[in-house]
A protein has these predicted regions:
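Flexible, compositionally biased loop and terminal segments
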Residues: 1-201
Length: 201
């Protein structure tokens, strides 16, 4: 939807993205961080598309940490393009209609090869997802802040992490089921530690 903003603002955003890629690429190499871009690239200037692709190729072998940047991205677009991909496979006869399920959809969605989103931080005082990562953030914890993105500090990021750590993630289960699962996990871990002679603090 951001393509609907004034042309001058869109052009400025594209320029800033190009500058950011140039400035940050050496840091990506230094810290071995992969860089990837998700979204519909059809409306992005060709020169910037080429720059994005080059950055992805240069950092493709860095898989321990990946920085994913959404450009021209929308959650509904993402699900539609995933559905088209699967529909094409069905039409081509390489996928049976009965095989289309959540797992297949996950494989076709953007970031499908990465774990689901655990924490989604929304800056700028807006209390909505704005069509962002609708599939990937299905079970994400949400953190909203009035702080604008350029002023979002490491201290506030740590605060978001701290609040995230206090939340109980149930994934459809009851609180009692979660606690029972945690107790079972702790008991199993203690038993394994005792058997191996290890101690944990």
């Amino acid at each position: 939807e951001n393509w609907q903003r004034p042309p001058a603002e869109v052009a400025l955003l594209m320029h800033l993205l190009a500058e950011t890629i140039t400035e940050q690429l050496p840091r990506m190499h230094a810290h071995r961080v992969g860089m990837r871009f998700i979204g519909d690239r059809s409306r992005i200037p060709v020169a910037l598309q080429q720059q994005m692709q080059a950055a992805e190729q240069e950092t493709a072998l860095y898989t321990d940490m990946v920085l994913s940047i959404a450009v021209g991205y929308g959650g509904m677009w993402d699900m539609a393009q995933a559905a088209r991909t699967l529909a094409g496979q069905v039409l081509a006869g390489t996928l049976a209609l009965e095989q289309v399920d959540v797992v297949r959809m996950q494989s076709a969605i953007s970031l499908g090869d990465l774990p689901p989103v655990d924490l989604l931080i929304r800056t700028g005082g807006d209390y909505r997802l704005s069509n962002f990562l609708l599939w990937q953030a299905a079970y994400a914890e949400l953190y909203f802040t009035d702080t604008l993105w350029p002023e979002f500090s490491v201290a506030e990021l740590e605060q978001a992490f701290a609040l995230f750590g206090q939340r109980e993630r149930r994934f459809g289960r009851t609180s009692e089921q979660v606690q029972q699962s945690l107790q079972s996990t702790r008991s199993t871990g203690e038993g394994m530690a005792g058997a191996s002679g290890e101690s944990h603090v």
